[in-house]
Amino acid sequence: MISTSEFKKGLKIEYKGEPYEIIDFQHVKMQQRAPIVRTKIKHLKTGRVLEENFPAGEKFEKPELEEKQMQYLYSQGDSYVFMDMESYEQISIPKERIGDAIYYIKDEMIVDVIYYKGEPLVIEPPMFVELRVAETEPAFKGDTASGGTKPAKLETGLTVKVPFHIQTGDLLKIDTRTGEYIEKVKE
């Protein structure tokens, strides 16, 4: 059992018989009332985000989730095909299930696929990925004086803000949790 005092971002709980992930939470103490935990939770099957208030100390079941390492093979229409690294079985996952994680996945990349009751739910790419800049504006002399940023479109279609010195063709390290540029990778 998981208590509200153990809540943290990314924790998965079972609420009303369905798997949810905690996106954000805040412990709130109110005058002359019992404290509550104001929580944003994301339904792992549908991706819908709910805002719920739980009494402090309420307990939740831990969902029966299974994590498998799979390799991304290719896209086929509105689905993406992955291969189980142990059984070599191939599964097709609809684009809606993958969500924004698709911006961090390249061919042959190993990802974690979270299963709930035998059904693939969530794709979790590695925490950091290296992606190449497909297009960005050229840097001009004097741009770096202000230390600003510019948009850059990466090979997967993701657009991130990068420093002015980044050019088309550069390899960048990206944080998949925030979608932010971390550093330029030396090749």
From Swiss-Prot:
Main location: cytoplasm
InterPro entries per record: Elong-fact-P_C, NA-bd_OB-fold, Rib_uL2_dom2, Transl_elong_fac_P/YeiP, Transl_elong_KOW-like, Transl_elong_P/YeiP_cen, Transl_elong_P/YeiP_CS, Transl_elongation_fac_P
UniProt xrefs under Pfam families: EFP, EFP_N, Elong-fact-P_C
Keywords, in A-Z order: Cytoplasm, Elongation factor, Protein biosynthesis
CDD domains per the UniProt record, alphabetical: S1_EF-P_repeat_1, S1_EF-P_repeat_2
Example GO molecular function: translation elongation factor activity
GO terms classed as biological process: peptide biosynthetic process
Subcellular location: Cytoplasm
Pathway: Protein biosynthesis; polypeptide chain elongation
GO cellular component, one term: cytoplasm
HAMAP family attached to this UniProt entry: EF_P
Function as written in the Swiss-Prot or TrEMBL entry: Involved in peptide bond synthesis. Stimulates efficient translation and peptide-bond synthesis on native or reconstituted 70S ribosomes in vitro. Probably functions indirectly by altering the affinity of the ribosome for aminoacyl-tRNA, thus increasing their reactivity as acceptors for peptidyl transferase.
Family: Belongs to the elongation factor P family.
Protein name per UniProt: Elongation factor P
Species annotation: Thermodesulfovibrio yellowstonii (strain ATCC 51303 / DSM 11347 / YP87)
Lineage per the UniProt record: Bacteria, Pseudomonadati, Nitrospirota, Thermodesulfovibrionia, Thermodesulfovibrionales
